[in-house]
Amino acid sequence: AGNVIMRKAATPGMESRKGIVLQAHMDMVPQKNGDKAFDFVRDPIEAYVDGEWVKADGTTLGADNGMGMAAILAVLESDDIEHGPIEALITATEETGMVGANGLKGGMLRGDILVNLDSETEGELYVGCAGGLDASITFSYEEESVPASSMAFLVEVKGLKGGHSGIEIVLERGNANLVLFRLLKMAEKAFGLRLSSVDGGGLRNAIPREARAVVTVPAAEAGAFRESVRDFERTVREELRGVDEGVSVTAEEAALPASLIDTDTQRRLIRAVHGCPNGVVRMSPSMKGLVQTSTNLARVVSSGGRIAVQCLLRSSVGSEKRDLGERIASVFELAGAEVVLSGAYDGWN
């Protein structure tokens, strides 16, 4: 499973103390800005210090869960802390399915108490964690020819802050996929917009920061379409004031695509994505400020006759998580898509 287990003997005289397991995970969320040339397999993170913060240039930093690993290594290296038996458990592939944790076998660990260090706030203890569920949606489409007298545009949504869908979802930041599909729906109605391709979001547990689509409109509507995009950008900026003020929505003329997504599939796709639940669904009734149930519309991408949509659902209440999955399935099944709910794992409190 790729896990690493390390052990440190107890301080002399403390061998009978209960053993402590310090746990973190070694993988990170590998996300970058669209204009950043970066290979997460080969390239080192370009970290820099900004005041009291360590940041990364155009990519995620990996503090989730590099901070936890650093804390564990500091404890293992120290010689000024008296302690009982200590084990360090560094699990693999946490971000994409808890693979390392699921690969643990009984008897591998000797400790009595496990302390998970996948957190970012000093001096606080977590008393629960949400469970998760993946919703994978697939549309099939036929290719249609581009109508005569069409103009093509690359529509891009950029500049959103994004964030971890299990942490920053409560901040109600913009979701690039939803911003894009809101625009597509408006322009489809107003200008007869046709969709050729779409590529929005990235990883399932990251709030989408960027999304783009290649579209066409009748040449006679091109000027009005451009102006409507500028108006739409102003509207979105106003709505996200104080939350995601860096958002930009642009439409730049592009080469005509070879084909378009068929009209029927386009119509069903745009309405289903636009109507998909996203963000905070319910706050905890018993703990102020705690998100109980949420969902992240993480990915929309077209390729080779198929359009894939991916959502990651979270809830500390199992029944709510399952029901939310069925709600999302209902939206997309009504739109003629195939829906698979998988990868469920339980929360705890």
Over which residues does each language-model region extend?
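A non-catalytic alpha/beta surface segment that caps or lines the substrate-entry region
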Residues: 1-18
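Hydrophobic residues embedded in beta-strands of well-ordered beta-sheets
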Residues: 4, 52-54, 305-309
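Beta-rich nucleic-acid/ligand-interaction surfaces
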Residues: 4-7, 90-104, 203-205, 348-349
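Active-site metal-coordination/substrate-binding segment of hydrolases
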Residues: 14-85, 90-96, 101-112, 134, ...
